[in-house]
Amino acid sequence: MTASVLLHPRWIEPTVMFLYDNGGGLVADELNKNMEGAAAAAAAAAAAAAAGAGGGGFPHPAAAAAGGNFSVAAAAAAAAAAAANQCRNLMAHPAPLAPGAASAYSSAPGEAPPSAAAAAAAAAAAAAAAAAASSSGGPGPAGPAGAEAAKQCSPCSAAAQSSSGPAALPYGYFGSGYYPCARMGPHPNAIKSCAQPASAAAAAAFADKYMDTAGPAAEEFSSRAKEFAFYHQGYAAGPYHHHQPMPGYLDMPVVPGLGGPGESRHEPLGLPMESYQPWALPNGWNGQMYCPKEQAQPPHLWKSTLPDVVSHPSDASSYRRGRKKRVPYTKVQLKELEREYATNKFITKDKRRRISATTNLSERQVTIWFQNRRVKEKKVINKLKTTS
């Protein structure tokens, strides 16, 4: 005795979609156990269907639980076996299922993953719904439910309608651990399923839609590289002469253009520019030189420690040269000094003040002149002694 099942063309073979956790853990172990249990249940259902078919038409209790129809049991076994085979390392397109089957395949937040018995029952219910729809010639009660299940995946509906069957995509098709099914809520079992694209073109469109693969433009990379070289290495690969400098500081070109007329080598100089105005540089330098508006005179290098002594710029210049310039005395001054020296070679304090007032010389100058005059006279006397 043989049994055959004719499925309606718009009903696709129901499969189960499992999502593997990248990190492993309890969820992955539980799913592996459930898949093994589903495979065992599928094998038991197939054996029961074969025994019932070979025993003269008496159905097995497992087949009777599926509705007493051998074709339904065989379809359930085939569906469970296909689910067990396609779940590992594959992500297949979920078929539109009945409400009961859909609730069996998906787990709500806070609930444990479906067990092996629940998976087998869901597969049997889906096969029974498919058989009922095919025998009645219409969508049956599962038609609206299938439409609602198909509406749940609105982003991928176009890709699902363009295919005639489930297209399996390998694990890691879109990259390292990328899943097009987003997790809803903090619970690891709260999963929102989404249909997979069925062809290569649809897969590419799906990746373009849900993955941001567009990188920065080549111009942006080149401009960033030029800016990096300009500010950190000092080489300008283009006319970067209108950039905005940092507030309070300026960039001065220290070397003329090396690569061409529109290129220059810049080295940032930390100079405050509160009171600076730009001056154009000659010789075609691509830049500006900043000079202070008001050139303040530098302070004198030497200042007297005495409060009554006032330093002059001429004195400062003389001290910078190391020796004050010799000022020759006038004939009137020399005549007055020689007259007083002839009277007395050593000058007194009162005479020094009087000579200083008469000759318009300082007392120190008068004293030094008398000292030098005595030394000169001594030299002349010594020379006369040596010659005679």
UniProtKB/Swiss-Prot annotation:
Keywords: Developmental protein, Disease variant, DNA-binding, Homeobox, Nucleus, Transcription, Transcription regulation. InterPro entries: AP_axis_regulatory_Homeobox (IPR051003), HD (IPR001356), Homeobox_CS (IPR017970), Homeodomain-like_sf (IPR009057), HoxA13_N (IPR022067). CDD domains: homeodomain. It holds the Pfam family HoxA13_N. GO terms for biological process: artery morphogenesis; branching involved in prostate gland morphogenesis; embryonic forelimb morphogenesis; embryonic hindgut morphogenesis; endothelial cell fate specification; endothelial cell morphogenesis; inner ear development; male genitalia development. Changing residue 372 to H: In HFG; severe. One of its GO terms (cellular component) is intermediate filament cytoskeleton. GO terms for molecular function: DNA binding; DNA-binding transcription activator activity, RNA polymerase II-specific; DNA-binding transcription factor activity, RNA polymerase II-specific; RNA polymerase II cis-regulatory region sequence-specific DNA binding; sequence-specific DNA binding; sequence-specific double-stranded DNA binding. Its main location: nucleus. Belongs to the Abd-B homeobox family. Sequence-specific, AT-rich binding transcription factor which is part of a developmental regulatory system that provides cells with specific positional identities on the anterior-posterior axis. Sequence-specific transcription factor which is part of a developmental regulatory system that provides cells with specific positional identities on the anterior-posterior axis. Binds DNA as a homodimer. Interacts with MEIS1, MEIS2 and MEIS3. This is Homeobox protein Hox-A13. The lineage of its organism: Eukaryota, Metazoa, Chordata, Craniata, Vertebrata.
